[in-house]
Amino acid sequence: MSEQPDYPAVELTEEGLAQAADAAIRAFGVASNLDELNIARRDHLGDAAPIPQARRSLGTLPKDQRKDAGRLVNMARGRLEKHFAQVKEVLEAKHLEEMLKAERVDVTVPTTRHQTGALHPITTLSEKIADIFVAMGYEVADGPEIEAEYFNFDSLNFIPDHPARTLQDTFHVGEPGSSQVLRTHTSPVQMRTMLSREVPIYVVCPGRVFRTDELDATHTPVFHQVEGLAVDKGLTMAHLRGTLDHLAKTLFGPETKTRMRANYFPFTEPSAEVDVWFPNKKGGAGWIEWGGCGMVNPNVLKAAGIDPEVYSGFAFGMGLERTLQFRNGLTDMRDMVEGDVRFTLPFGVQA
């Protein structure tokens, strides 16, 4: 660091102060960069500089001279600081311009490609199905995963000793006698919707469900379903069939077909299994079991306070893991739940 020059004392006169200010302004003017300007500022505005020293010497003057001398010192200092600010602004602009030139980015240089993440295929498939139904005028409904037995079983026409209610099939949670379970299907959302909304009702209910299955190539204790419910006047199995046909063709392609096989579910009557003809099935085109469906059981409508003599409804549901598995030719359901990022990256499975 350079030493500060040893300046002679400044006369507390207008001429003496003007000479000191002129010397400082000349020093500011010859500075070629901010570092040199800061050195000049220290030399001419620092504590040992002439004008600050002149200010401190005001106390040695007779009282009647201090006011005028103080005014002259302040004028000189103000002139100096104003000029310093002007020079600093110019040098800062010059420094910024030089810095920008030195840091110029060559846009022709190839960049490093960063790997991006992707939504899990189950999430993407769920959102796609929801979008299909929203386009048909349906609403998306959701409900709690920890559910009362009443909504999971009783209100859906499950008899008290139905095997699905046992510990072998259902996770019972909470204190003994609390009647709380991890929902085994998304059908409770349908009942909650019927209780909370006025008819007509058209909703689709995607969500996570839980069953006491062992994790293997075709089963998982935590999986995803999507269910649909329509309640209105005059609905029939024909409306249900048309809805499922539209869903299948939109999801799998225009050559896709559906068929129904009679079955039994407590909450629908009549009930059916729905199969889909999938032209891109691994091993060749063929029929694949897809889900369950049927007309809403009158007892379920009554539990929701809906008159089955006036209104009818249909419902359907399918597993998203199974849908993704046959649509994308996956052989092991464990790939969907083990969290391997290679499974979800864009170049992997696309949903």
UniProtKB/Swiss-Prot annotation:
Keywords: Aminoacyl-tRNA synthetase, ATP-binding, Cytoplasm, Ligase, Magnesium, Metal-binding, Nucleotide-binding, Protein biosynthesis. Its main location: cytoplasm. The keyword Protein biosynthesis applies. One of its GO terms (cellular component) is cytoplasm. GO terms for molecular function: ATP binding; magnesium ion binding; phenylalanine-tRNA ligase activity; tRNA binding. Its cofactor is Mg(2+). InterPro entries: aa-tRNA-synth_II (IPR006195), aa-tRNA-synth_II/BPL/LPL (IPR045864), Phe-tRNA-synth_IIc_asu (IPR004529), Phe-tRNA_ligase_II_N (IPR004188), Phe_tRNA_ligase_alpha1_bac (IPR022911), Phenylalanyl-tRNA_Synthase (IPR002319), tRNA-bd_arm (IPR010978). Its EC number is 6.1.1.20. The keyword Protein biosynthesis applies. Binds 2 magnesium ions per tetramer. Mg(2+) binds at residue 269. It is found in: Cytoplasm. CDD domains: PheRS_alpha_core. It catalyses: tRNA(Phe) + L-phenylalanine + ATP = L-phenylalanyl-tRNA(Phe) + AMP + diphosphate + H(+). GO terms for biological process: phenylalanyl-tRNA aminoacylation. Belongs to the class-II aminoacyl-tRNA synthetase family. Phe-tRNA synthetase alpha subunit type 1 subfamily. Tetramer of two alpha and two beta subunits. This is Phenylalanine--tRNA ligase alpha subunit. It comes from Corynebacterium diphtheriae (strain ATCC 700971 / NCTC 13129 / Biotype gravis).
